[in-house]
């Protein structure tokens, strides 16, 4: 378990296991809160800007991002789907979105 939430300036995980590797959020100076990261490195949350535009060296599913077709923004990857059908909350529009089989497109669920 990697949890760098106690260090707001940590920008990478050099020396971490191969599947974690090197991560760098280019849109802000700090990438934090990698709770639950070691297995296949899915949960990422940049607490400074809430926008993961570029994660150099991140796994493909992270680099692709999670795009909300409702507000046209990339959603936070905190609580990102671990399997098809898991719900995610888009911080851009507060809608709930759900992955389809390619893990990059979503069905929109307006909570109102």
Predicted features and spans:
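Concave beta-strand-loop units of leucine-rich repeat
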Residues: 1-9, 17-30, 38-51, 57-73, ...
């Amino acid at each position: 378990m990697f949890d760098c939430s106690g260090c707001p300036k940590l920008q990478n995980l050099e020396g971490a296991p191969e599947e974690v590797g090197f991560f760098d959020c280019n849109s802000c100076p700090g990438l934090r809160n990698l709770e639950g990261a070691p297995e296949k490195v899915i949960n990422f949350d940049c607490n400074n800007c809430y926008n993961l535009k570029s994660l150099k060296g991140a796994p493909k599913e992270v680099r692709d991002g999670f795009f909300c077709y409702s507000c046209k923004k990339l959603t936070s990857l905190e609580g990102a789907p671990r399997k098809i059908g898991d719900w995610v909350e888009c911080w851009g529009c507060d809608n709930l979105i759900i992955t389809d089989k390619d893990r990059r497109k979503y069905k929109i669920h307006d909570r109102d």
